Amino acid sequence: MMAKPNGKIQFKNLQSHGVLADPDFPKRTWKLLKTAMRQIHQQNASNLSFEELYRNGYNMVLQKHGDLLYNNLKKMVDKHLKAVAKTVSESIDEKFLLELNSSWINHKTSMLMIRDILMYMDRNYVKQNNLSSVFDLGLYLFRDNVAHCSTIKDRLLNTLLSMVQKEREGEVIDRILIKNIVQMLIDLGVNSKNVYIEDFEKPLLLKTSSHYQAQSQTLIQTCSCPDYMKKVEICLKEELERVSHYLDSSSEPKLKEVCEKQLISNHMRTLIDMENSGLISMLKDDKIEDLKRMYNLFSRVSDGLNLMKDVISSYVKEIGRGIVMDEEKTKESGTYFQSLLDLKDKYDNLLQNALYNDKQFIHSIQQAFEYFINLNPKSPEYISLFIDEKLKKGLKGVSEEEVDIILDKILMLFRLIQEKDVFEKYYKQHLAKRLLLGRSISDDAERNMIAKLKTECGYQFTSKLEGMFTDMRLSQDTMSGFKTYIQNLKKALPIDLNVHVLTTGFWPTQNTANCNLPREILLCCEAFKSYYLSNHNGRLLLWQTNMGTAEIKANFPSKSHELQVSSYQMVILLLFNDQSKLTFKEIADQTGIPTIDLKRNLLALTNPKNKILDRELPSTTSSTTTTTTTATSSSTSTSPSSSSSSISTPTPSKSIDESDVFAFNTKFKSKLFRVKVMAVVQKETPVEEKETRDKVDEDRKHQIEASIVRIMKARKTLEHSNLVSEVIKQLQSRFVPNPVIVKKRIESLIEREYLERSKQDRKIYNYMA
């Protein structure tokens, strides 16, 4: 409803005078009022006495002539507005709206004056008879006689729509004039906006829809996706400006809906699928601004973000699947996992800078990563290997803050691994090597990683890892006591022995065949065993020669070197103090080293980088020379030895064959005095993979059974499907149990009388205390 002027004519000390019954009073008084109202309509009211006019109107109502006054007013204004409508209709071109606006302003002003004159009638007669007020009556009459005049109504609509269209096409229009006309339509609805809605808003929305339908079809065929979106942004901005300048605010959501439907909703799929510029192209080329623009536009319409989210998720799955199934990338665990980290960084950046960290996109992309990272059964091993590489040398020279960031990134992908128990197996193996070989770049970094795993998976997950650190600390104390013990005996050992005492349950120990250690080594081992068992009665020591290292002195013709080798390599090299050359079988028989481990260590010793041994075919002949090797220390056991040995010339080979013959490399040279010769790191053999998997499966059986018992102990009675669901829910932080395996473990527990089937329903289990 229009805002009515605050100014009113004030009548002070007005008194009612007795009026004698006069049959001509109504007619005479109306004539006087009518003349005054005509002058008001003609904008010639300066000489009128409004106090006298008010008194006449007051007396008319007082003398019960309110109906006459009201009806005559209606007729007079009606007649006047018909003349106004004729004048407006006759105006041409651009003068049409100006004339209409002028007539409207004059009419409002006139009706305000007339309202003040007939104020008493408004407050009494009109209110008592539930009629429209004087001013509202004027609005209704203007609506019916002018705005809805047959020669004005359609012309008014067409003129307004034409002006809006011209502005859309870039022309400058009189926004203030349109605003006044729009306000007129709003005012003519009195207490509603029906006139504005029916006469202008609805046709405007239809016109807007057809305009942008045509424009969008043209743009979608001629523009790239980014260019189209930029033009859409401009269109939407201009439409909002239109609302603020001359439309009613209630039109904004309706206008937005129409524009967004034609410009966005109807073309979402086309925009996404545009070749070389659509959503996939933006993702490939990291078009952050374009992706952000698409998010902003698609967020305006129903299902826009869902469509965008699904396409991104499918694309991420496709790219991730390509990485985890790429044979070249999976050959190197570092390359494999770094590719996944790079992909994660890329989409974390996209989420933050283009998608406003929208939770539904975060969840969708995370699900995509979880999908493809678990396609490769080796992912748990590769994550552990990647961490192993970082904690050995990849974090060297990096600040604590940067280390924390890198470990957190790794942990983000670790969370997505379903087989966390498999990861734990490999992590224990790799951590054991780092600790025993002293390869960790930082004890703090190791503990930081374990703390993060503990936060992520709980104490049970890391308790054995923490136990490994405890063993390392206690071993230092044990060795300190052992050295004091030897000193007190006043009998020096032939080598500097360092032993790590490992708790079987914590470390990934193996039931390997005992290696045939030299006599001097065995002497040292027995001395340590005697000391240890005297302090820890009832314990059993099993030597893990495969996990040890040694430092031995090797005398080559050119110079002497200190070799850092594994315990197996030490045992192999010491054989050449007594023999000139040895076949693979002879080395195997004399050392007792398992074939797989023997091949790995011989491959390391014949590696061109640090070629300590030569290989030759059985028929090859060679000259000989003499060298001496002396063992100086070992993590588990070592033995000194000194004697001559004949060695053969080298024969290149990339793999160890059981027919190979080995000899000491007299031509070995190195700029370094201390030469590190460690076993060649190879991927697990199929047999080793099966052993690891069997261990994991066996552990899972126990964990599933423990979970079943815990649940049934608490619930007492439970239906099969509910029990399986609860077991999966309880264990999914470590691995996702196969329902078939869960069923087998339930049956095993029934056989062992932990559970029983209900007699009423065999699908229901009861806990047996």
From Swiss-Prot:
Residues 618-653 have a biased composition (Low complexity). InterPro entries: Cullin (IPR045093), Cullin_CS (IPR016157), Cullin_homology (IPR016158), Cullin_homology_sf (IPR036317), Cullin_N (IPR001373), Cullin_neddylation_domain (IPR019559), Cullin_repeat-like_dom_sf (IPR016159), WH-like_DNA-bd_sf (IPR036388). Residues 699-761 form the Cullin neddylation domain. GO terms for biological process: protein ubiquitination; ubiquitin-dependent protein catabolic process. Probable core component of cullin-based SCF-like E3 ubiquitin-protein ligase complexes which mediate the ubiquitination and subsequent proteasomal degradation of target proteins. The E3 ubiquitin-protein ligase activity of the complex is dependent on the neddylation of the cullin subunit. Residues 614-655 are annotated as: Disordered. It holds the Pfam family Cullin_Nedd8. Pathway: Protein modification; protein ubiquitination. Its main location: nucleus. It comes from the Eukaryota. GO terms for cellular component: Cul3-RING ubiquitin ligase complex; nucleus. It is found in: Nucleus. One of its GO terms (molecular function) is ubiquitin protein ligase binding. It comes from Dictyostelium discoideum. There is a cross-link at K713 (Glycyl lysine isopeptide (Lys-Gly) (interchain with G-Cter in NEDD8)). This is Cullin-3. Transmembrane segments: none annotated. Keywords: Isopeptide bond, Nucleus, Ubl conjugation, Ubl conjugation pathway. Neddylated. Deneddylated via its interaction with the COP9 signalosome (CSN) complex. Belongs to the cullin family.
